[in-house]
Swiss-Prot record:
<feature type="topological domain" description="Virion surface">
    <location>
        <begin position="24"/>
        <end position="55"/>
    </location>
</feature>
<keyword id="KW-1133">Transmembrane helix</keyword>
<feature type="signal peptide">
    <location>
        <begin position="1"/>
        <end position="23"/>
    </location>
</feature>
<keyword id="KW-0472">Membrane</keyword>
<keyword id="KW-1040">Host Golgi apparatus</keyword>
<keyword id="KW-0261">Viral envelope protein</keyword>
<dbReference type="GO" id="GO:0016020">
    <property type="term" value="C:membrane"/>
</dbReference>
<keyword id="KW-0732">Signal</keyword>
<dbReference type="GO" id="GO:0019031">
    <property type="term" value="C:viral envelope"/>
</dbReference>
<keyword id="KW-1043">Host membrane</keyword>
<keyword id="KW-1015">Disulfide bond</keyword>
<feature type="region of interest" description="Disordered">
    <location>
        <begin position="23"/>
        <end position="48"/>
    </location>
</feature>
<dbReference type="InterPro" id="IPR034707">
    <property type="entry name" value="HSV_GN"/>
</dbReference>
<dbReference type="GO" id="GO:0044177">
    <property type="term" value="C:host cell Golgi apparatus"/>
</dbReference>
<comment type="subunit">
    <text>Interacts (via N-terminus) with gM (via N-terminus). The gM-gN heterodimer forms the gCII complex.</text>
</comment>
<protein>
    <recommendedName>
        <fullName>Envelope glycoprotein N</fullName>
    </recommendedName>
</protein>
<comment type="similarity">
    <text>Belongs to the herpesviridae glycoprotein N family.</text>
</comment>
């Protein structure tokens, strides 16, 4: 049972790395259009309101974590199938 445990550990590390990378992704600094309170057209003052929208990186973290965990499950199943096929071939 050594290889499946290694796959599980590697999978967990992969999921954690993806979650950390997705959380750190995205631009730094001020959001677009808020540089000094002026927009890019004519230099007019831009009034912004908080509409409760999440930033794209923050919204995508659950998606990336879910996709990574699904990938880990698929890899684990493929490893199990390959082990069974190899064991059946040697029997």
């Amino acid at each position: 049972m050594g290889p499946p445990r290694r796959v599980c550990r590697a999978g967990l590390l992969f999921v954690l790395l993806v979650a950390l990378a997705a959380g750190d992704a995205g631009p730094r600094g001020e959001p677009p259009g808020e540089e000094g309170g002026r927009d890019g057209i004519g230099g007019a003052r831009c009034e912004t309101q908080n509409t409760g929208q999440m930033s794209a990186p923050g919204a995508l973290v659950p998606f990336y974590v879910g996709m990574a965990s699904m990938g880990v499950c698929i890899i684990a199943h493929v490893c199990q199938i390959c082990q069974r096929l190899l064991a059946a071939g040697h029997a």
